[in-house]
Structures are given as structure tokens and as C-alpha cells.
Amino acid sequence: MSARIIDGKAAAARVLGQVRDDVHTLKAEGIEPALAVILVGNDPASEVYIRNKIVRAEEAGIRSLEHRLPADCSEARLLALIAELNTDRSVNGILLQLPLPAHINEAHALQAIAAAKDVDGFHSENVGGLSQGRNVLTPCTPSGCMHLLKETCGDLTGKHAVVIGRSNIVGKPMAALLLQAHCSVTVVHSRSTDAKALCQLADIVVAAVGRPRMIDAGWLKPGAVVIDVGINRIDDQGRSRLVGDVDFDNALDVVSAITPVPGGVGPMTIAFLMKNTVTAARQQAHAQRSQSEAVCLSIY
């Protein structure tokens, strides 16, 4: 079997093209989408991620605002900045780059971001709304994975999907989105005793466990579609390179389609961050119009 390599870069380019069109429409209505990015400290990997996000925002026509805080800044200072951005009507999305320094409570900081501006989809209001099937801002990586799956498979109804990993960022929201698409969903994790056997039954496998090449061909059903979320840096004969959670070369002869690492899920995450920013801008503009109309009606 010759597997199809799912091109995340090409798919992301299509999503960003639609985002650009949406931004153009919003600007014609007097709405300029804006994304505020907060970086605490100077972690090299975070610097790269931030730079990539800002470049994509500029390409899409989204105004980006960069806020940098020193690594030793207090949690109170970070929360004060978030509160200021929450009330700034010119800012539609707030992105807090993770990880944060150890002395700052990550959960507190993420929860402080207004749900309407939470373009990462991590606020409890958005998490709860996702589980209820409401129209909320959803986490970017799972949303990107779903887009790739729908482009690759079409209708997902009735397919058996296994999600490997139960993180709040990928595993749990991924399972919720697959359920919304009418899949039968199994989540396996570090305490699962039959993870391999469950994966062998899956039409769709989403790997998000953070262990390099953990899943080989023996885990996979012939013809399965594999979305590899893992990004792991390994030493390969003295050279550093990125690999996924799936042994890519080993799986190629078994699966029908698979995402590469890099070039698979990563570009989709940033594309859906931009998409969420535009969605947030549109929703906020609608809410402000509705509020203004309500005020006018109350006057008359």
C-alpha cells in the first residue's frame, strides 16, 4: 500500500487564503482584526513560534501587537496586562505563549483571558461550550487536525477514531470534535492497558503523546488515516531533527494517509489561530452592534 502524504502546508495555505478574504471583507465594514501576543521571558523555542505567528498574521492582514514581559515578572503584572487587553476594543484576540515561567500559575493566566478573545480556546467557557457542541472558539491544533481529516476522508460519520493522549490542549478537545463529527471515539493514555490493541481497530488515529516514534506499523490497522501531532527533537547520527509520535517510514506501507513531521499539523495550528482571530473579530463586532441597537431601543 502506498500511503498518501497529507500536505499540511498546502492545506494551511488554503485556510489562510480564506482568512485573507474574510479580513478584506471585515475591513470593508470598518473592522480591523487585531491579535495581541504575550511572551513572558525569552525561551528560544517560544521566540520562533511567536515570530511565525506574527508573520502569518501580517500575511493575512491581521494587525499584531507584541507584548514582552521579563522572565521574572510577577503573576500580578501579567494578569494586569491581560485585564487591560480584555477591555481594549481594538484587540480581538489574545494569545499567551506557553510555557510560562514556573512561578506563574498557567491555569490562572489562561482563565484571565476573556472567553470572547481566547483565540487558543483554552478558557473554561470555551472548553465547556465545545463539549456541549456550541459555537465557541476551539483549540487551534485539534481544529486543524479536523480540517485535514475532513479533506482526506470526507464524511467521518461512523468511523472509529482513537486519540492517543488526553491533554487539555489536544487530546480532550480532539475527542470532542471527533464526537461532533459522529465518530466512535476512544481515548488512550499512559494508564491504558490495551492501547496498542485499541489502535489496531481504528480507522483514524490521532497521536498526541509526545514520545518520538512510539507508534509503529504494528499499532495500525491497514488503511488507517494517521494524524501525527507529536513534535519531538531527536539526535540522529549526530544531527538534530524533528520526528513525530508515529514511526513515519515504518507506517507508510500500512496506512492509507499520514501527516509528516514537520509539515503536517504544525502549519494548520497557526492557520487556525488566524481563523479564530477573524471569528473573534466578527463575533465581537456583532455583539457591539447588538448592544448599540439595544441602547437605542431603550432610549426610544
Curated annotation (Swiss-Prot):
Query: One GO CC term of this entry?
Result: cytosol
Describe which pathway this protein belongs to, using the record's wording. One-carbon metabolism; tetrahydrofolate interconversion
Keywords assigned by UniProt, alphabetized: Amino-acid biosynthesis, Histidine biosynthesis, Hydrolase, Methionine biosynthesis, Multifunctional enzyme, NADP, One-carbon metabolism, Oxidoreductase, Purine biosynthesis
Q: What InterPro entries is this protein classified in?
A: Aminoacid_DH-like_N_sf (IPR046346), NAD(P)-bd_dom_sf (IPR036291), THF_DH/CycHdrlase (IPR000672), THF_DH/CycHdrlase_cat_dom (IPR020630), THF_DH/CycHdrlase_CS (IPR020867), THF_DH/CycHdrlase_NAD-bd_dom (IPR020631)
Q: Does the keyword S-adenosyl-L-methionine apply?
A: no
User: Care to name a GO molecular-function term for this sequence?
Assistant: methenyltetrahydrofolate cyclohydrolase activity
Instruction: State which Enzyme Commission number(s) the record gives.
Output: 1.5.1.5, 3.5.4.9
- For this protein, what reaction is catalysed? (6R)-5,10-methylene-5,6,7,8-tetrahydrofolate + NADP(+) = (6R)-5,10-methenyltetrahydrofolate + NADPH; (6R)-5,10-methenyltetrahydrofolate + H2O = (6R)-10-formyltetrahydrofolate + H(+)
Is Transport there in the keyword field? no
Q: Which residues bind NADP(+)?
A: G165, R166, S167, S190, I231
In the record, biological process GO terms are: L-histidine biosynthetic process; methionine biosynthetic process; purine nucleotide biosynthetic process; tetrahydrofolate interconversion
Record-linked CDD domains = NAD_bind_m-THF_DH_Cyclohyd
Function, as annotated: Catalyzes the oxidation of 5,10-methylenetetrahydrofolate to 5,10-methenyltetrahydrofolate and then the hydrolysis of 5,10-methenyltetrahydrofolate to 10-formyltetrahydrofolate.
By sequence similarity, the record places it as follows: Belongs to the tetrahydrofolate dehydrogenase/cyclohydrolase family.
Q: Which HAMAP family match?
A: THF_DHG_CYH
Q: Partners and quaternary state?
A: Homodimer.
Q: Which PANTHER family match?
A: C-1-TETRAHYDROFOLATE SYNTHASE, CYTOPLASMIC, C-1-TETRAHYDROFOLATE SYNTHASE, CYTOPLASMIC-RELATED
Q: What is this protein called?
A: Bifunctional protein FolD 2
UniProt source species: Pseudomonas syringae pv. tomato (strain ATCC BAA-871 / DC3000)
- Lineage from the top down? Bacteria, Pseudomonadati, Pseudomonadota, Gammaproteobacteria, Pseudomonadales
